[in-house]
């Protein structure tokens, strides 16, 4: 028979053993907290898991009681990041991102010609919302351009009310007697301003000089200005070396200064020559002389090869040198063939 004392002692030991099985500190779960958090728990004590701000639970238990065994049950709770709504398509711009989960950030940029009206980035918050609010890409606008002194707007078509959009242009022209320095066309830039304005300046030119053996005509007024014109001519026996008409330039000088050059008397009585790609009789074509600058090609014979070739001669201010190889054909030597009728080399 078992002693009552032994039974009482055994019961005491059993109670002490069971009562001493405390639960350890619970396992850490990603993105979660435990309340209360202690190093050990007595049997019967309760703990509660909760997800940290910005995270939500996806299955699993949240509350546990320390059992008499001192072993916590397996916890299957999962805390996952909140997901912010799709940021959408940024019209006239782009959105750069990796995910829409907390606490990620997305960034924004606009196409050329547009600017960000709002922040250049937004963060997915603990509440699953974007902060700050998503921006928009607004068009870059330039105000009406300033008009330079002594200038007028020749072309200007604002495309945004009275304002202009990126890459719009405006074209200026100067008032009469004024020259433009700089580009006549300005452009609306990405900074919302215009490219550099041109400058209009009054420009005067001196009266052109009369050429020797010639004359000059220009407007009968006290002063000649930018774009004014003068015309030149030569007396008989002279030809103009340069343009017939010149113009006052923006630099305050004339575009050219022609002169009168003497004509040349043809030094041969009879010959077939090439003038401007055609065969002509020099005694007929230039019976009144050759003008300064005129060029002809004389025919010469190569006696060894029995063929012909040409050499050039040009009238320069009253003088022309006939090629030494040229031999003027005599009508008396009818049996000889003129060089112009010999086959070319």
Curated annotation (Swiss-Prot):
Disulfide bonds join 23-66, 51-79, 84-124, 110-137, 142-188, 174-200, 205-248, 234-260, 264-315, 300-325, 307-345. Residues 263-345 are annotated as: Sushi-like. It is found in: Secreted. The keyword Repeat applies. One of its GO terms (cellular component) is extracellular region. One of its GO terms (molecular function) is lipase binding. GO terms for biological process: blood coagulation, intrinsic pathway; chylomicron remodeling; negative regulation of angiogenesis; negative regulation of blood coagulation; negative regulation of endothelial cell migration; negative regulation of endothelial cell proliferation; negative regulation of fibrinolysis; negative regulation of myeloid cell apoptotic process. InterPro entries: Sushi/SCR/CCP_sf (IPR035976), Sushi_2 (IPR015104), Sushi_SCR_CCP_dom (IPR000436). Changing residue 325 to G: Loss of phosphatidylserine-binding. Glycans are attached at residues 33, 149, 162, 183, 193, 253. N- and O-glycosylated. PubMed:6587378 also reports glycosylation on 'Asn-188' for their allele. Residues 1-19 form the signal peptide. Residues 21-81, 82-139, 140-202, 203-262 form the Sushi domain. The keyword Secreted applies. Keywords: Disulfide bond, Glycoprotein, Heparin-binding, Repeat, Secreted, Signal, Sushi. Binds to various kinds of negatively charged substances such as heparin, phospholipids, and dextran sulfate. May prevent activation of the intrinsic blood coagulation cascade by binding to phospholipids on the surface of damaged cells. PANTHER family: COMPLEMENT C2 (PTHR46393:SF7), SUSHI DOMAIN-CONTAINING PROTEIN (PTHR46393). This is Beta-2-glycoprotein 1. The gene is APOH.
